[in-house]
């Protein structure tokens, strides 16, 4: 029936309109909090893995040494990490990152209990990025020294020492592997923090 149309008794009819009600507001799915909890637990587990990698790398590098006897009496060749400042920087940086990861464990536990925390997670993500940069810089510098120890440099007339100091080179190489593995874990930690913050934005 159109507006203004007259009905049988001669009176105009009034237009009728259908009311449109907005759809009811549905609560957010419970799966969101479950995903945040999984991300927080993964963050905590990865921190333990990174602690093991950095601690193992620092200990392996700081305790490595090898002495070669020489034909002449009282003459020995000894190789230690402290002979090279780059390797000393590697040990210090790995120790600092390991200490930071240990101190960050309480905050990670809080995120498991309260997955919705934002400010502490943002601070942790920033510090994780700083520690990642420090660990990557020290490991990259140490990797250059380890490469020279294995291959030497023909242009600089440097000879490799790993044919003589086999045990020393094996330990510092294993230390680098653990350090780069910890760096990969830190990348994963930064990604998890960014993902959690993006979900809460």
UniProtKB/Swiss-Prot annotation:
Belongs to the Casparian strip membrane proteins (CASP) family. GO terms for cellular component: plasma membrane. This is Casparian strip membrane protein 5. Residues 56-86, 150-171 are extracellular. GO terms for biological process: cell wall organization. Residues 1-34, 108-128, 193-201 are cytoplasmic. It comes from Oryza sativa subsp. indica (Rice). It holds the Pfam family CASP_dom. The chain crosses the membrane at residues 35-55, 87-107, 129-149, 172-192. The keyword Glycosyltransferase does not apply. The keyword Flavoprotein does not apply. It is found in: Cell membrane. It is a multi-pass membrane protein. Homodimer and heterodimers. Regulates membrane-cell wall junctions and localized cell wall deposition. Required for establishment of the Casparian strip membrane domain (CSD) and the subsequent formation of Casparian strips, a cell wall modification of the root endodermis that determines an apoplastic barrier between the intraorganismal apoplasm and the extraorganismal apoplasm and prevents lateral diffusion. Residues 1-26 are annotated as: Disordered. Keywords: Cell membrane, Cell wall biogenesis/degradation, Membrane, Transmembrane, Transmembrane helix. PANTHER family: CASP-LIKE PROTEIN (PTHR36488:SF12), CASP-LIKE PROTEIN 1U1 (PTHR36488). Its main location: membrane. Residues 1-11 have a biased composition (Acidic residues).
